[in-house]
């Protein structure tokens, strides 16, 4: 079943792009000036947001993923993005609990030796759960909410929304979530933002490397994970933007509805098609092979679905 998406256009993002897209080329093309990182604290749990400079006509996609049969068509193309901040790591179990007062993860004990349980990525979260988390995190830090979910003509009050009120089955109201990218709160990355961050200023196939034999240094995937998640920011190297686990550990939800191919070259701050059945997931996981861990590999799942191999990270405006 297809669901119509109510989208609030990015207000003023074109102006942000014009002001922020100063030429400073890197291997992936189009990168702008450096953007400062930011560390936040919620209920004593710290997390870091890494600055990603605005980009003009940056290179995304990959020739290995030019056909739909290769995991959702994502041929080489260009995209322009306003500056943003993205989580240094996937959302951890401890941060999720601090915001949502809930621990949904299946990997909730027996961490790998030398790893801390609460710093493993949260999993078994739906796209709906991510929307609620983002708004609740924004409220806790005094920021504007990026998402509006309207039920019976009235917007949900996320400050009082109970965890068990988040739908566990397909829900038209949540599928029609309105997104305002001009707000300064937390949200899911768009597919384009996610891929640009994963590439880390390079044209590498995976986050951190272009060499298959070196992937083990950057990613937890089926060849080295031991069939479980691992503490974020532990034992693996970051990519060129100092982001951890953009390849592997858990798949990551994005904002966009899944479509058969990525947008054509030349778009600015694309947010995907207006409706669909599946929401985008990226990055591969502890369960997946190296092909699915590639920066350009695309997949999708129903927004109410959960999995032990799926989590998320957040973004926000500077």
Describe the function of each predicted region.
Residues 2-11:
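Bacterial N-terminal signal peptides that target proteins for export
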Residues 2-3, 17-43:
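Bacterial Sec-dependent N-terminal signal peptides
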Residues 59-83, 100, 107-112, 228-235, ...:
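Short, polar loop/linker segments at the starts of domains and inter-domain junctions
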Residues 73-77, 202-203, 225-228, 246-318:
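Surface-exposed recognition segments
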Residues 62-67, 80-209, 258-260, 318:
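Active-site microenvironments of metalloenzymes and redox enzymes
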Residues 31-53, 57, 183-186:
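GGW-centered surface loops in extracellular recognition modules
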Residues 10-18:
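Hydrophobic helical h-region of N-terminal Sec-dependent signal peptides
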Residues 169-181, 216-247, 273, 299-304:
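Short, well-ordered junction/capping motifs at the entry into regular secondary structure
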């Amino acid at each position: 079943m297809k669901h119509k998406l109510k989208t609030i256009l990015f207000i003023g993002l074109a102006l942000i792009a014009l002001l922020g897209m100063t030429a400073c080329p890197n291997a992936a093309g189009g990168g702008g000036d450096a953007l400062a990182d930011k560390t936040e604290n919620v209920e004593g749990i710290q997390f870091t947001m890494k600055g990603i400079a605005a980009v003009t006509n940056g290179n995304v996609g990959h020739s290995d993923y030019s056909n739909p049969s290769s995991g959702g068509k994502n041929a080489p193309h260009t995209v322009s993005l306003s500056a943003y901040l993205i989580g240094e790591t996937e959302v951890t179990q401890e941060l999720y609990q601090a915001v949502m007062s809930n621990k949904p993860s299946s990997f909730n004990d027996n961490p790998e030796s030398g790893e801390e349980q609460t710093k493993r990525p949260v999993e078994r979260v739906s796209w709906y759960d991510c929307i609620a988390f983002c708004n609740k995190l924004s409220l806790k830090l005094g920021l504007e909410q990026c998402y509006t979910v309207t039920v019976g003509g009235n917007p949900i009050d996320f400050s009082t929304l109970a965890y068990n009120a988040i739908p566990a089955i397909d829900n038209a109201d949540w599928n029609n979530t309105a997104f305002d990218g001009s707000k300064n709160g937390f949200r899911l990355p768009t597919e384009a933002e996610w891929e640009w961050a994963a590439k880390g200023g390079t044209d590498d196939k995976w986050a951190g490397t272009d060499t298959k034999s070196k992937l083990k240094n950057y990613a937890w995937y089926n060849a080295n994970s031991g069939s479980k998640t691992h503490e974020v920011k532990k034992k693996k190297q970051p990519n060129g933007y100092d982001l951890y686990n953009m390849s592997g550990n858990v798949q990551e939800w994005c904002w966009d509805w899944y479509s058969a191919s990525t947008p054509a070259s030349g778009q600015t701050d694309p947010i995907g098609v207006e409706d669909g059945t599946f929401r985008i997931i990226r990055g591969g996981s502890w369960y997946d092979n190296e092909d699915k861990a590639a920066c350009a590999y695309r997949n999708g799942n129903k927004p109410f679905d959960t999995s032990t191999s799926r989590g998320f990270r957040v973004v926000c405006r500077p």
